[in-house]
Curated annotation (Swiss-Prot):
Binding partners and assembly: Homodimer.
Top-level division of the source organism's lineage: Bacteria
Protein name, UniProt field: HTH-type transcriptional regulator GalS
DNA-binding region: 4-23
Length: 346
């Protein structure tokens, strides 16, 4: 996909100059205009008309794209965006992508048509190239929980690898070795990084986890319950589980209780995100805190700066997760022996 950067490179000018030509600015010489339009023709570049319309307009709305605003994680993200928006006397428009590339693309385009010149986008389905083209045309577009090469200053991310290592090391430090992983079936980068962190921490202790230690499901409570049942059915004698997120961990707790397995007496479990449900499960869930509210607030400020042309191109924005200790983890050597009936369930 040809971007405005490709046109600038071909014409031997800056991206800003190409933008001025495409927006019919009078601050461009005839020769420069001719060189840019020649490059546009040769590369068959087609600028986004909606994006061009935004270039010279000020909007009182901020757009935000999330997977599903009904999910507590994304609800917290949107609330944080709205808090910053209100401070700037702006309103928030929301688009849901539901984990689908076409809906993700459509949500962004609709918000552009609504004249949102500041966009906070949680994108997992679109390619780097397509996102780069949107970002080339929308200076106020910022990505959250993803980094597109060349646009790190407009991306706010989390170190998922470190968070997963942190969770797994806590279980290892409590005497656990047979540690399963509840994986998201959506196949996104977050899951790949958390799985890699889990494997990395185990390998530090010379433990090579087999594929059978991984149960997959949708990243929600029903998915976590199904993935945990899958692991239990393999009779693996796991003593601990690290879940992709808190929703999956909560679902896993239901499956474990249904099978007579007491948490953390017989099996320990750790989640990821620290959404409100983690404080209200029984037992309360030990988890890795994802500072989504802080990340969303920063992303919104960056989007507003970008829309105003004031963003720092040298900056980077990567957050570190933290461990939240509650009551779903116990030291393995102090754990109660699993009864015959429970052992059969496992």
């Amino acid at each position: 996909m040809i971007t405005i950067r490709d046109v600038a490179r071909q014409a031997g000018v800056s991206v800003a100059t190409v933008s001025r030509v495409l927006n019919n600015s009078t601050l461009v010489s005839a020769d420069t205009r001719e060189a840019v339009m020649k490059a546009v023709s040769e590369l068959d570049y087609r600028p986004n008309a909606n994006a061009q319309a935004l270039a010279t307009q000020v909007s009182d709305t901020i757009g935000v794209v999330v997977m599903d605003v009904s999910d507590a994680f994304f609800g917290a993200l949107v609330k944080a965006v709205d808090l910053v928006a209100q401070q700037h006397q702006k309103y928030v428009l929301i688009g849901n992508s539901y984990h689908e590339a076409e809906k993700e693309r459509h949500a962004i385009e609709v918000l552009i048509r609504q004249r949102c010149n500041a966009l906070i986008v949680h994108s997992k389905a679109l390619s780097d190239d397509e996102l780069a083209q949107f970002m080339d045309n929308i200076p106020g577009m910022v990505l959250i929980n993803r980094v597109v090469p060349g646009y790190a200053h407009r991306c706010v991310c989390l170190d998922n690898l470190s968070g997963a290592r942190m969770a797994t090391r806590m279980l290892l430090n409590n005497g656990h070795q047979r540690i399963g992983y509840l994986s998201s079936s959506h196949g996104i980068e977050d899951d790949a990084m958390r799985k890699a962190g889990w494997m990395s921490a185990l390998k530090e202790q010379d433990i090579i986890p087999p594929e059978s230690w991984i149960g997959a499901g949708t990243p929600d409570m029903p998915g976590g319950e199904a993935a945990m049942v899958e692991l239990l059915g393999r009779n693996l004698q796991l003593t601990a589980v690290f879940a992709y997120n808190d929703n999956m961990a909560a679902g896993a707790l239901t499956a474990l209780k249904d099978n007579g397995i007491a948490i953390p007496l017989h099996l320990s479990i750790i989640g990821f995100d620290d959404i409100p449900i983690a404080r209200y499960t029984d037992p309360q869930l030990t988890t890795v805190r994802y500072p989504i509210a802080s990340m969303a607030k920063l992303a919104t400020e960056l989007a507003l700066q970008g829309a105003a042309g004031n963003i720092d191109p040298r900056a980077s924005h990567c957050f570190m997760p933290t461990l939240v200790r509650r009551h779903s983890v116990a030291t393995r050597q102090n754990a109660a022996a699993i009864t015959n009936s429970t052992n059969q369930a496992m």
